[in-house]
């Protein structure tokens, strides 16, 4: 008689990470029993989830300090992500150069976490074609979900739908499939907005109310013209993380539609996330306005 399968101690950590419950991941790692016999691959996955969660809550230096030069490839990649996100221009260039060196190494270049980090960094650089080069071959649900995000950023919802169909064929009920479905629905608009709202509502009943889920629900409500209820969800999200980029950006948009001042949220966004797309767009608009004023003065 075959022995019972060993428990998957990382199952809950993965899903907490997917929905943005980063503190739950950090706490959950500590709760894994010391007697749990994790394989080397499982140990690397556990640590990558842990350190990616620390990055998500802004603890970049902790990640840089704790991951040594002899760490496994996935952890080296995660450390480079922390370096990229915490550094100035020099740090970013150094991180990208080292990532490219790892990607060019036939022995480790196909590692899924390495490719995921490369895709993340290049998305920050707005090099979407370059990001897709590393993520397009898929291999994990996270990589497929990133493909959907990249295609949507490239305004190729047709390609995003193709990637979504691949995810649905693999596991229609997977949380990342549901999230990707909601992202596509939000871009498609129309009747799809209600479907996206139902997805986020379902996720909010399964998981804690994270910034990711609250912002998803709020975006749906804003698309439906319900800015007051959207504002309530966004303020709840702001209470969870006062520096969350998407919460601040969505509060700017929501406040403007409610006829309220958005300057405080915009200033917070500029301070915490100066490279955010909304900040750059508004700065560009201000520059264009100033030039127009100078031209007619």
Curated annotation (Swiss-Prot):
Compartmental location: Cytoplasm; Golgi apparatus membrane; Cytoplasmic vesicle, COPI-coated vesicle membrane
Keyword Signal: no
Membrane topology, from the record: Peripheral membrane protein
Pfam families named among the record's database cross-references: Coatomer_E
Keywords: Cytoplasm, Cytoplasmic vesicle, ER-Golgi transport, Golgi apparatus, Membrane, Protein transport, Transport
Example GO biological process: retrograde vesicle-mediated transport, Golgi to endoplasmic reticulum
Xref: InterPro entries: Coatomer_esu, TPR-like_helical_dom_sf
Gene Ontology cellular component list: COPI vesicle coat; Golgi membrane
GO molecular function, one term: structural molecule activity
Role, per record: The coatomer is a cytosolic protein complex that binds to dilysine motifs and reversibly associates with Golgi non-clathrin-coated vesicles, which further mediate biosynthetic protein transport from the ER, via the Golgi up to the trans Golgi network. The coatomer complex is required for budding from Golgi membranes, and is essential for the retrograde Golgi-to-ER transport of dilysine-tagged proteins.
Family under the similarity heading: Belongs to the COPE family.
Subunit relationships: Oligomeric complex that consists of at least the alpha, beta, beta', gamma, delta, epsilon and zeta subunits.
Name under which the protein is recorded: Coatomer subunit epsilon-2
């Amino acid at each position: 008689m075959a022995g019972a399968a060993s428990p998957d101690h990382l199952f809950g950590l993965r899903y907490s990470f997917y929905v943005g419950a980063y503190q739950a991941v950090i706490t959950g790692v500590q709760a894994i029993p010391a007697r749990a016999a994790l394989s080397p691959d499982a140990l690397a996955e556990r640590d990558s989830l842990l350190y990616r969660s620390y990055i998500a809550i802004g603890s970049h230096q902790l990640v840089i300090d704790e991951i040594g030069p002899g760490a496994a490839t996935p952890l080296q990649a995660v450390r480079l992500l922390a370096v990229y996100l915490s550094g100035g221009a020099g740090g970013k260039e150094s991180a990208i150069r080292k990532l490219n060196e790892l990607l060019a190494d036939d022995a480790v270049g196909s590692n899924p976490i390495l490719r995921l980090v490369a895709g993340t960094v290049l998305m920050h650089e707005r090099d979407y074609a370059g990001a897709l080069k590393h993520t397009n071959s898929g291999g994990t649900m996270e990589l497929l979900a990133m493909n959907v995000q990249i295609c949507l950023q490239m305004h190729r919802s047709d390609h995003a739908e193709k990637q979504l169909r691949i995810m649905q064929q693999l596991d229609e009920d997977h949380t990342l499939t549901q999230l990707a479905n909601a992202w596509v629905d939000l871009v498609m608009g129309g009747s799809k907005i209600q479907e996206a709202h139902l997805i986020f509502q379902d996720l909010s009943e399964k998981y804690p109310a994270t910034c990711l889920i609250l912002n998803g629900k709020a975006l749906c409500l804003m698309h439906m013209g319900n800015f007051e209820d959207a504002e309530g969800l966004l303020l709840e999200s702001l209470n969870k993380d006062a520096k969350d980029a998407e919460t601040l950006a969505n509060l700017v948009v929501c406040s403007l539609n409610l006829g309220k001042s958005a300057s405080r949220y915009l200033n917070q966004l500029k301070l915490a996330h100066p490279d955010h797309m909304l900040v750059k767009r508004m700065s560009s608009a201000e520059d264009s306005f100033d030039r127009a004023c100078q031209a007619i003065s």
